[in-house]
Amino acid sequence: MTTYDPSQKSLGKEKLSRIPVKIEATHTPLRKPDWIRIRLSTDSKVSQLKKLLRENHLVTVCEEASCPNLNECFGHGTATFMIMGDKCTRRCSFCDVGHGRPDPLDPEEPVNLANTVSIMSLRYVVITSVDRDDLRDGGAQHYAQCINAVREKNPGIKVEVLVPDFRGRMEKALDQLAQGLPDVFNHNIETAPRLYKQARPGADYPWSLALLQTFKKRFPGIPTKSGMMLGLGETREEVETVMRDLRQHEVDRLTLGQYLQPTRYHMPVDRYVTPQEFQELGELAKKLGFSNVASGPLVRSSYHADLQAQGERVS
């Protein structure tokens, strides 16, 4: 069993010291508007779930990425599992997940994940991961093993994956993923291409679009999904262009949410998008042909993913 050592990863200032576009530390961040306030929970379910996760040597993106919805989701007994460790090979300046030399894959992780999902009595599970540029298939085989283990232990469950870009190894990764296909395939486009060098160093906008479309062409019966964060400095026109690009690349579902700065060393919040604008963008997305849209300040790609999959409104 692989034990993850959180002391061996860089965070915040240290993590972002080597990205190509330097970010000045924020000294006077924008004041959060009332609609972005997050209620903290003292529910015992939160601590119980954290205990269960640690006992099974599992990591959640909810914790690692400092998700604003953690208390709500944990309080309801749901979580988005982050496989393949807690150290990412990328240094995205919007993300709070740590950077470092990844640990070896844990061969027991698929079974531990399946058992935890069973204990939680989940009917819908989201599996994501760090980027693993050190692996020849980007970790796709491990994804398939986790999906298959979860399904074997939990008959009837629906599995959504939120995958990295598998840059430089798309065909190999999709060949491996074909051995354990998900019910929903999600890869987040994150932001407008103009901001990629600053926000997503190591990623490539056309490549991400191609990954989504290539998966759809190979597995046309599986819904594809992507998401954007707003408030990084993009314009309304750029948001609409990205939405159209996603539709042109056969993406079925869309999430839009507000970017929140994890620390003062990360990309600053350029603006807080109003609930009204989120509603307008959601309506436009539906007109563009997305079958399912979740648009709101606290929406994240896996926030109430089960309800998103059922077509219910999430905002």
From Swiss-Prot:
It is found in: Cytoplasm. Its cofactor is [4Fe-4S] cluster. One of its GO terms (molecular function) is metal ion binding. InterPro entries: Aldolase_TIM (IPR013785), Elp3/MiaA/NifB-like_rSAM (IPR006638), Lipoyl_synth (IPR003698), rSAM (IPR007197). Keywords: 4Fe-4S, Cytoplasm, Iron, Iron-sulfur, Metal-binding, S-adenosyl-L-methionine, Transferase. Disulfide bonds: none annotated. Its EC number is 2.8.1.8. GO terms for cellular component: cytoplasm. It catalyses: [[Fe-S] cluster scaffold protein carrying a second [4Fe-4S](2+) cluster] + N(6)-octanoyl-L-lysyl-[protein] + 2 oxidized [2Fe-2S]-[ferredoxin] + 2 S-adenosyl-L-methionine + 4 H(+) = [[Fe-S] cluster scaffold protein] + N(6)-[(R)-dihydrolipoyl]-L-lysyl-[protein] + 4 Fe(3+) + 2 hydrogen sulfide + 2 5'-deoxyadenosine + 2 L-methionine + 2 reduced [2Fe-2S]-[ferredoxin]. [4Fe-4S] cluster 2 binds at C88, C92, C95. [4Fe-4S] cluster 1 binds at C62, C67, C73, S302. SUPFAM superfamilies: Radical SAM enzymes. It holds the Pfam family Radical_SAM. Residues 73-291 form the Radical SAM core domain. Binds 2 [4Fe-4S] clusters per subunit. One cluster is coordinated with 3 cysteines and an exchangeable S-adenosyl-L-methionine. The keyword Magnesium does not apply. The keyword Cytoplasm applies. SMART domains: Elp3. Pathway: Protein modification; protein lipoylation via endogenous pathway; protein N(6)-(lipoyl)lysine from octanoyl-[acyl-carrier-protein]: step 2/2. HAMAP family: Lipoyl_synth. Belongs to the radical SAM superfamily. Lipoyl synthase family. This is Lipoyl synthase.
